[in-house]
Amino acid sequence: MKGRSILQSQEGFTLIEIIAVLIILGILAAVAVPKYVDLMANAERRALDAAVSELNGRETLTWSNIMLSAAGWASDAATFGAVDTDLGPDYTWGGGAPAATGGTLTFGNQSLALNRAASTASSPGRWSTP
């Protein structure tokens, strides 16, 4: 058996290599965390935009069903009352429910004020951002 000193037989990383890796990880974390936060805010805003499209689709479907019914269109209040504005547990309306003229919709940390144009006998109501 060959004789080796204790220092020659030890293997591993040097202190310089460990510090270099920690510095690189710190730089990556400093760059990645703000991007992640921006990504979350952007996703929440896109979810609100999708909700506006969903509300417009529901408004059009409800208006179409009313127009095809025997009674036909009577008033915007009747049309708005028939529209399902519950978008699920992740969305909340300021004040609990929207008004016939609009409301504030919140998803996550993002809120969006919405306006609603009234329906008429010739067109459904439309949701939009100011």
Model-assigned labels for residue ranges:
Residues 118-130:
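Short, low-complexity, Pro/Ser/Thr/Gly-rich segments in the mature regions of secreted, periplasmic
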Residues 11, 17-20:
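Internal alpha-helical transmembrane segments of multi-pass membrane proteins, especially GPCRs
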Residues 1-13:
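N-terminal leader/signal peptides at the extreme start of proteins
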Residues 64-118:
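Extracellular/periplasmic head regions of type IV pilus-like filament subunits
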Residues 1, 23, 36, 55, ...:
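Conserved short hydrophobic patches within well-ordered secondary structure
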Residues 35-53:
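Aliphatic-rich helix starts adjacent to a transmembrane/signal segment
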Residues 51-69:
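N-terminal alpha-helical signal peptides/signal-anchor transmembrane segments
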Residues 19-35:
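Alpha-helical hydrophobic helix detector
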